[in-house]
Amino acid sequence: MEELRCPEAKLAPPEVVIATEAPPPSLVDRYFTRWYKADVKGKPCEDHCILQHSNRICVITLAGSHPVLQSGKAIQRISYQISNNCSRLENKVSGKFKRGAQFLTELAPLCKIYCSDGEEYTISSCVRGRLMEVNENILHQPSLLQEKPSTEGYIAVVLPKFEESKSVTEGLLTQQQYEEVVVKRTNATATTP
């Protein structure tokens, strides 16, 4: 049996492929939908970000345009003591039905952030639901709030009522709508003398 040969056929040199793909989405971008509340309680630039998981859990964080995240701000301390009778640290949740969780409205304060320049910021819930947990790590390491606001520097975790889980996002902005608000705000301050 004669061996078949094809002398004209040559292997092409291997091609060098440069990866031009975008990096994979972060864990937060993969599993959470970002919602925003601009100018919370009518205070300009005090924007909050709500990360909503598919299981309806909401993680409350600061939006990138919040004054606390701007350069030059130094956080002096953070307090979950809302009033003399109310501390978010006393929230004790137990059981399948999350007994003992504090109920929050959209405007309920979660914590207060005190900056070294004397400014004080009250962070609100932005969603109705039960307070599952607060991030005690930011009490001891306030810099987490500025360094990793969407992950380790979150403020609190809120669980909306099941019946209200679809309506939670009413009144909140999508990522694109929020970016438009920030651009308009930037343009307005740039044109104002």
Swiss-Prot record:
Keyword annotations: Actin-binding, Cell projection, Nucleus
Tissue expression remark = Detected (at protein level) in liver, lung, heart, spleen, kidney, and ovaries. In brain expression is higher in the hippocampus, the nuclear layer of the cerebellum, the cortex and the caudoputamen.
Give any GO molecular function from the UniProt entry: actin filament binding
Cell compartments where the protein resides = Nucleus speckle; Cell projection, Lamellipodium; Nucleus; Cell projection, Growth cone
* Cited Pfam families: GCV_H
InterPro entries assigned to the protein according to its UniProt record, in alphabetical order: Abitram, GCV_H/Fam206, Single_hybrid_motif
Q: Which GO terms describe its cellular component?
A: dendrite; filopodium tip; growth cone; lamellipodium; nuclear speck; nucleus
Single GO biological process annotation from the record: regulation of filopodium assembly
Q: Which family does it belong to?
A: Belongs to the ABITRAM family.
Question: Subunit details for this protein?
Answer: Interacts with F-actin. Interacts with G-actin.
The entry's function note states:
Actin-binding protein that regulates actin polymerization, filopodia dynamics and increases the branching of proximal dendrites of developing neurons.
Q: What is the designated name of this protein?
A: Protein Abitram
* Protein species of origin: Mus musculus (Mouse)
What lineage is on file? Answer: Eukaryota, Metazoa, Chordata, Craniata, Vertebrata
Q: Which gene encodes it?
A: Abitram
